[in-house]
C-alpha cells in the first residue's frame, strides 16, 4: 500500500509538471519566424510567418488613411521590428509603418498608407517550406484594370517605339519586313483610350471608412473584398478610317493589334522550383519573359503590330485564375506560360511544351507536373474565403476543343524552334495535361518548360544571358509561325 501511494504521488507530481509546462507553452504564444513584404502595382502583400496560428483584428482609419492590425498572443520581437525596414519607397500603397506592444500579449502594427485600400487578412496553414502564415493583402479601392495597364505601358513606350511596325528584323532569325507604303499614323491601342474613359454602369461604392471616433480602436472592422479585376471586355480595337488615296492592302495591315499574354510562373511567396545551386524558377522565368516581351513589342505579323502583356512584371504572386482572367481582359490572341521546373531526380533534362487536355494526361510525368503546378496557389497563398476566388475557379472549366487544337499547333511550332537553337527536348511532341492556367476557353494557350532547373547543367544554362536570349528568340519565332 505504501509503495502504491508513493507511486501515485510521483504520477501526480509528474502530471503537475506537465500541466505547468503546458501553461508555460500557452503563455509563451507563437514565435515569429520571418516577415516578408511583396509590393506590386496590383496589390502589396505583407506576410508574417510563425510556428503557430496567429489571431488578429484590424481597423481601417481614414484622413489620413491607415490600417491598424492587432496580433494577439505574442510579444514584440526583433523579427517583427524588421518590418519597418522592409517597406520600400516605391511601394504603391504603404508609406511606412510602426510596430509596438499595444497591450500585454498584443502587438499592434500601424500602416501609414499612400492611398485608401481594401485589405484582405487571412491565415494559411503550413505548406511546402512554410509554417503558419498571417497574410495581409492591400488592394486599391478601384482594382487595377489590365487593359488600362496595357494602354499606359504603350503610351510610355510611344516616344521610342514609333517605328515598331517595321521592326520585325530586330528579332534574331526573323526575316526583314518587306518594303511597303507607310501605314496611317495611328496606334491601335489608342482607340481604347476613349472606350476606357466611359465605363458601363456606375462604379462600385468604396468600402465604408471607419474613423477613430466612430469605432473603438480595439474592434475589428468587416472587410469588403476588392472588386473583381476583370470588367466587361471592350471591343477589339480597330484603326480609324484610312485617308483617301491609301490602298486597301495598307489599311488591312493596320486594322488590329496582336496581343500575346506572357505568364511568368510563380512569384512572390511562391519561388517555384529551386536548382541545386539555389537558382529560383520565379526569377529565371521573369527574366525570359521580359526578353520575350522586348521582341514581341518590336515585331509585327502581316503588318499588324504585336504587343506583349505580362500577367506579372515583378516579383509578386498572381493566383492561377487571375492569370487567366488578365489574359481574357486584354483579349489576348495567345497565352504563353513560362516555367523551368524540377523533377525528383537531377537526371531529368530537356525542354517541354504542354497544352491542355480534357481527357487525361498524355503521360504520367505530364500528370505529375500538372498536379505540381496546380498546387501553386497553395504555396503562393490564396484567400479561399474570397468570393472572387470561387468565380476564378469557375472560369477555368470552360475550355474548348478548338482552343486545344490551336494550342497544339502553337506548341508544336515552339518545340521546333527550341530544338533549332540546339536545346535538348524532353519530349519531341507537345504533351497534354490538366494545367489550370491553360484553361482560357477562347485563347490558344501553352505552357513552356524551358528546362529542368533541377539538372545542374541546365540550371547553369538558364542563368546565362546568351542562353536566355536564344530561348526568347526561339519562342518568338514559334509565335510568329
Question: What do the PLM-derived regions correspond to, one by one?
Answer:
Residues 74-76, 265-269, 343, 451-455:
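Short connector loops/turns at beta-strand edges and beta->alpha or beta->beta junctions
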Residues 81, 271-278, 456-462:
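Short acidic, glycine/proline-rich loop/turn micro-motifs
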Residues 2-253, 258:
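Signal-peptide-cleaved, periplasmic/extracellular N-terminal interaction regions immediately downstream
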Residues 56, 344, 395-481:
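Active-site-adjacent mobile loop/cap segments within catalytic or ligand-binding domains
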Residues 190-200, 210-389, 400-410, 473:
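Catalytic-core regions of hydrolytic enzymes
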Residues 75, 117, 142, 296, ...:
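Conserved NTP-handling cores and scaffolds of large molecular machines
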